[in-house]
Amino acid sequence: MGMEIFDYEDIQLIPNKCVINSRSEADTTVELGGRRFKIPVVPANMATVINDEIAKWLATNDYFYIMHRFAPETRRAFIETMHAAQLYASISVGVKSSEYDFIDDLATNQIVPEYITIDIAHGHADSVIAMIKHIKDVLPDSFVIAGNVATPAAVRDLENAGADATKVGVGPGKACITKVKTGFGTGGWQLAAVRWCAKAARKPIIADGGVRTNGDIAKSIRFGATMVMIGSMLAGHQESPGNILKIDGKTYKQYYGSASETQKGEHKNVEGKQMLVPYRGRLVDTLNEMQEDLQSSISYAGGRDLKAITKCDYVVVKNSIYNGD
């Protein structure tokens, strides 16, 4: 393949001369599908990360969100509720025949979500290409995000089919065991995969999975992501779905992968696991901290907005950024 292989922990970005007086001057906003959002972060469309209330709060506060698809019968009402509140609607769909019926029902009733994410584990598939074409045919005004993929060929195929953005990452997530169960994926080289795919992309890329620190958001931007999808770091909040558990005086919340037994309710083709994540307090505090850290990243990059990060030099420090800890 002749490409550099690295992941988040292998990279350090190199600072440039600072041109702003305070990090609060740094602009972290990003545009996607004709809307501008506060930060280039989207909570994972997983049942332990997002629900109706969180989606509504995010949209009201200028954050991007993608609603999960694990209560499919509620999606039409969700879109109508969001539109009634004069908010944008952003939903997920799969590729089964019932999903075609759902899309056709929306089209017939002129219920048009602003964003539709076609979300399956192996997104470089004829089934995904067919669904992109169908949505673009009957709901041409919806912005279509398709995934998940791991290669430039996949990005090109989905973009050529009509996708407006692609989601990159197969199995690097904390609650994902695709890498262990199948031997396939971007676990351990997710950031290099983002870079590889971004070089081929003509449209935005969403880096999905493997982000463990706020600095990883800046690294994703550096290597070509427009938006970064975050699961485990945005789970475990006061508002998050899932039960609060106390163990040995510590507080946790449940977190599970989208193809886990807990999610599916059956032990078949399981590629996700259930785990506990530390209780993290209020979601707004975490999102504010992400924004502040990204503002600091911009100031280190020597610029005023996210574009500055894309021009930074970097070094590859094979697994050693934590060596001093």
Swiss-Prot record:
Gene3D superfamilies: Aldolase class I
Catalytic activity: IMP + NH4(+) + NADP(+) = GMP + NADPH + 2 H(+)
Catalytic activity, EC: 1.7.1.7
SMART domains: IMPDH
Catalytic residues in the record: C176 (thioimidate intermediate)
UniProt-recorded name of the protein: GMP reductase
Function: Catalyzes the irreversible NADPH-dependent deamination of GMP to IMP. It functions in the conversion of nucleobase, nucleoside and nucleotide derivatives of G to A nucleotides, and in maintaining the intracellular balance of A and G nucleotides.
A cellular component term, taken from the record's GO annotations: GMP reductase complex
UniProt cross-references to PANTHER family, sorted A to Z: GMP REDUCTASE (PTHR43170:SF5)
Gene of this entry: guaC
Any one Gene Ontology BP term: purine nucleotide metabolic process
Binding-site residues, NADP(+): 205-228
One Gene Ontology molecular-function label: GMP reductase activity
Range of residues in the leader sequence: none
